Structure formats: structure tokens, C-alpha cells
């Protein structure tokens, strides 16, 4: 295999070349597989839509970037987990932004970002309020970007209250990805999440408010899927309030045609100023979140595509998932500038990405490694999950490679690992242990928190690790592994060894 593509930061030199070539049809996501979700995509049109969408495809998020533009300030509902504060540059939560944009400024920003981050494939309008509560700037932004940036996928996120009203408009503008936040289908649950909704000139509270919201959300979802618009449903997991109920939510939205369900953890802290933050409502542990995602995925034996790699992005996020480059694109970088949209350069960059993805997929096929998705050569077959697996954490900057120093990681990707098995099941945020070569040991609590976050993992894979963290991980019973290789290959190989070497009582089904 050749080295990583030029768009990815990587050590000099490439990976070992594979011993045998696999068919090129295995490459990238332009197959009939779901490319990282647990169910197949038999429709070639859908497969093409999600091929380079970093939110809808787990594999694509290693290669393609997204950006959000904050053009929608107002909201028509109040959530107990939300506080739309402006100028919160140090926060990474949905609904926060540093700057509100006009549609014209949004277009200018998209042009600048698309020229510099050529792997940016998706534009989303996700706040800081609700896009459909601000239809004029939302749809004007979509019109401008569609006119000038024809290769960028258009998405919007909504609470769904006004969704049925705008389904035809969304379809007419060729927006083919819509995310709806649905946290309940039972108003009794909803009244504990939503203090009020503003509907047709009146403010409603209590169960009546939640009933109106739920009816509109489900009607909007059904109408979108009838028009073959791909829908992702976001749900915030709130322990003790809707955690058990979300299994029913998942079952319902699947029945209405939702393509993907994203169960996210509640982000709750007093400094956020939310009702839940101020009242001490806790969020779920990573283990609780994974258990609920697993239940939703396999409810009643019917598989639901679950998003496992969400980063709960800001309303002005820019870059790869897990990477926020918003500070590189402040208003002074795009306001008043005339940028020629580099369509040819972007197409060349995307072709390079796809060549690399083809090599990665071919190597995976040659080594007979399953990732939890059905394979293109046997589309009807279930992936064979080993009876015994362990969890393995990976430090990566993307491109499908273990290529990050342990101390530089702001997040770890969590994989199920076993013989011939490497399945991404979660990402976990941590505080970077190192901010440079000279300040890796000043705050031992950062390392302690990272180790606690990875306490259920059998190993950590990274490109480099210092002696101190290595010893601390070993003391905690976590094996540190220095390696530079394909993630799937490294995870499957390490998993096979760990499953073989560990006592039966230590190996389970995470």
C-alpha cells in the first residue's frame, strides 16, 4: 500500500504494500454497502448520496470534512439541555456560535473554506436556532450555495416543529439530507424535556406542547422519506428521563423511513446555563451510551443504522469531525473578498481521496477484515462477529490510519476488536495530555481522566507515547501499542492477540 494522500498529515513513508490486489469495486463507499453502518444500502442512489458524507457514513468521516453556517438565530421551542449563547468560542456544543452570518456572508465563507479545505463535501445549516424557524435566511443561503458551489451537499437540521410546512420547499431546493432532533414520542416524557413550544402564534407548555411537537416531527419525517430525502434522527440520551424510551423512538422512526439514528449523550454542566446543567441532571457514561445504541440497533431483531461517530458539532463548525478549524475562518478572512470557486481543484482532491479509500478497502478485503458492514460481494450476508471481542482505543488524525501521538489526541476512537474484526462503536473526547513538547507532565489529572475514560479498553493504539503515560496505562491494565498502520488491520491483529492471550473471564462482549 502506498502512503497516505497529500491532504492527510502523516509521517514520511508509506504503509507496507499489500501482497495481493483486491477488486477495485471494493474501494471507497461507492458500493452497495452502508460503508460503516450495520445494514446494507442496496439502492445505488442512496449509496452515492452518502459516499462522501462524513455524518451519514462512518468511513467517510475519516476523509471528508463538513462545515456549518450560523444563519438562523431564533428558535421556536425551548429545550432543557439548550442555551443558545453567542461568542462561546471555547465550547463545543450544538447550538453555539461566535458569529451570526447573513446569507451573503455565509456564501463568502463557504467559498473560502471550500478553496482551502478541498475535502469539505457538506454544508449544514444547524443553528444557532432552528433553520425552519428562520426560513428566509435559511433558504436564501441554500439557494446561493447551490448556485455557486454545485458539488457541495446541502443539509439542514431542525427540531421538526415547522417541518411539514417546508417539505416541498426543501425538496425543490434539492436538499437531500435532513436531520430531525426527536427526543421523545410520548408527551409525558416530552414535558420533562421541553418547557414550551411556540406554535401558530401561541406558546404551549406541558404535555400539550410536547404532543404538538411530536406530531409535527413524525409527520415531517414521513413526508421527507416519501420524497426520498435521506433523514437522520438525532436523540439526546438523558438518563432517568428518556433513556429507556429511546428504544421505542428508534423503532418508530425506523418504521417511518429514517435512514440513520444518532443517539447522543446529554452535554450538561452548570457553566452552560441550561436547566439540566443548573439542576444537576447528569449525562450518560460512555458505557451507558454504547449499551443504549446497541439496543436501538438490534431492537426486535430489526437492524437500525446507528451513527457511532457524532461529535455534537457547533453551529459554526468547520473541518473534519473532531477537528474544529472555526478560528481559521473568522469574518475578516471572507467578508469583502472575491473568491473564484475552484471546482477542478476540489474534484482532483476528491479523486485522490477515493484512490486512497480504494487501497484501504482492498487491503481490508485481502486480509478478510470485517467492520460490521455487509460486504459488496455477498450483500445479503451478515458480517460474522467473533464470539469474543475486546474494546481497543485508537489515536488517529483520520485517513484510516493510526497516526497520532497519545498525548496529542483530543479524542479516541473506540473499536470492537477480535480475529478479523474491527468495528467502530464510539468516539470519546479527552483533554489533550500534551499541548507541545514541553508541557506533557504539568497536569497529571488530565492523564488520570483519560485513563478513566478508557478504563474498559484492553489496549490503546497510537503512533507514539511517552514513558510516563505508558507506565500509567500499564498500571491500569491497558496495553499501550505504538504502531503506524491501517486502523482496521491494526485493530483486528491486536484484537486477535488479546482475545487469544487473555483469560476467558477477561474477554466478553463489550
Curated annotation (Swiss-Prot):
InterPro entries noted in UniProt: Aldolase_TIM, Di-Nase_FeMo-co_biosynth, DiNase_FeMo-co_biosyn_sf, Elp3/MiaA/NifB-like_rSAM, MoaA_NifB_PqqE_Fe-S-bd_CS, Nase_CF_NifB, NifB_C, rSAM
Residues annotated as binding [4Fe-4S] cluster 2 are 310, 313
Q: In which pathway does it act?
A: Cofactor biosynthesis; Fe-Mo cofactor biosynthesis
List the GO molecular function terms. 4 iron, 4 sulfur cluster binding; lyase activity; metal ion binding
Might you name a Gene Ontology BP term for this protein? nitrogen fixation
Q: Where does [4Fe-4S] cluster 1 bind?
A: 75, 79, 82
Q: Which SMART domains match?
A: Elp3 (SM00729)
Ranges of compositional bias, category Low complexity: 1-16, 25-34
Radical SAM core domain segment(s): 61-308
Full protein name: FeMo cofactor biosynthesis protein NifB
Amino acid at each position: 500500500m502506498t502512503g497516505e494522500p497529500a491532504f492527510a498529515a502523516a509521517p514520511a513513508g508509506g504503509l507496507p504494500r499489500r501482497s495481493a490486489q483486491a477488486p477495485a469495486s471494493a474501494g471507497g463507499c461507492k458500493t452497495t454497502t452502508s460503508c460503516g453502518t450495520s445494514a446494507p444500502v442496496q439502492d445505488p442512489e442512496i449509496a452515492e448520496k452518502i459516499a462522501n458524507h462524513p455524518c451519514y457514513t462512518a468511513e467517510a468521516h475519516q476523509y471528508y470534512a463538513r462545515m456549518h453556517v450560523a444563519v438562523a438565530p431564533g428558535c421556536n421551542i425551548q429545550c432543557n439541555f439548550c442555551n443558545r449563547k453567542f461568542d462561546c468560542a471555547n465550547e463545543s456544543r450544538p447550538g453555539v456560535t461566535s458569529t451570526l452570518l447573513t446569507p451573503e456572508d455565509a456564501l463568502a465563507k463557504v467559498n473560502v473554506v471550500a478553496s482551502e479545505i478541498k475535502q469539505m463535501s457538506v454544508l449544514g445549516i444547524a443553528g444557532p436556532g432552528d433553520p425552519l424557524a428562520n426560513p428566509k435566511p435559511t433558504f436564501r443561503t441554500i439557494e446561493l450555495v447551490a448556485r455557486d458551489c454545485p458539488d457541495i451537499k446541502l443539509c439542514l437540521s431542525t427540531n421538526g416543529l415547522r417541518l411539514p410546512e417546508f417539505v416541498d420547499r426543501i425538496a425543490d431546493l434539492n436538499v437531500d439530507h435532513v436531520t430531525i432532533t426527536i427526543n421523545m414520542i410520548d408527551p409525558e416524557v416530552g414535558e420533562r424535556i421541553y418547557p414550551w413550544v411556540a406554535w401558530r402564534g401561541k406558546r404551549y407548555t406541558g404535555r400539550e406542547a410536547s404532543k404538538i411537537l411530536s406530531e409535527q416531527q413524525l409527520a415531517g419525517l414521513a413526508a421527507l422519506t416519501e420524497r426520498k430525502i435521506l433523514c437522520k434522527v438525532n436523540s439526546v440520551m438523558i438518563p432517568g428521563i428518556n433513556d429507556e424510551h429511546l428504544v421505542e423512538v428508534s423503532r418508530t422512526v425506523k418504521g417511518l423511513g429514517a435512514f440513520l439514528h444518532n443517539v447522543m449523550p446529554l452535554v450538561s454542566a452548570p457553566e452552560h446555563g441550561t436547566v439540566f446543567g443548573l439542576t444537576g441532571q447528569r449525562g450518560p457514561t460512555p458505557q451507558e451510551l454504547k449499551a443504549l445504541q446497541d439496543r436501538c440497533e438490534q431492537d426486535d431483531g430489526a437492524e437500525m443504522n446507528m451513527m457511532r461517530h457524532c461529535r455534537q458539532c457547533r453551529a459554526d463548525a468547520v473541518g473534519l469531525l473532531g477537528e474544529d478549524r472555526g478560528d481559521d475562518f473568522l469574518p475578516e478572512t471572507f467578508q469583502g473578498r472575491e473568491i473564484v470557486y475552484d471546482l477542478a481543484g476540489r474534484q482532483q482532491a476528491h479523486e485522490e481521496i477515493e484512490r486512497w479509500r480504494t487501497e484501504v478497502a482492498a487491503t481490508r478485503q485481502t486480509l478478510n477484515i470485517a467492520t460490521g458492514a455487509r460486504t459488496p460481494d455477498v450483500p445479503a450476508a451478515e458480517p460474522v462477529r467473533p464470539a469474543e471481542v475486546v474494546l481497543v482505543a485508537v489515536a488517529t488524525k483520520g485517513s484510516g490510519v493510526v497516526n497520532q501521538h497519545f498525548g496529542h489526541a483530543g479524542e479516541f476512537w473506540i473499536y470492537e476488536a477480535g480475529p478479523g474484526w474491527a468495528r467502530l462503536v464510539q468516539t470519546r473526547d479527552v483533554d489533550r495530555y500534551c499541548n507541545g513538547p514541553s508541557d506533557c507532565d504539568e497536569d497529571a489529572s488530565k492523564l488520570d481522566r483519560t485513563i478513566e475514560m478508557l478504563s474498559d479498553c484492553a489496549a490503546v493504539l497510537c503512533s507514539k507515547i511517552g514513558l510516563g503515560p505508558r507506565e500509567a496505562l500499564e498500571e491500569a491494565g491497558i496495553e499501550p501499542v505504538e504502531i503506524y498502520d491501517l486502523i482496521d488491520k491494526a485493530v483486528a491483529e491486536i484484537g486477535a492477540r488479546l482475545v487469544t492471550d487473555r483469560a476467558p473471564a477477561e474477554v466478553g462482549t463489550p
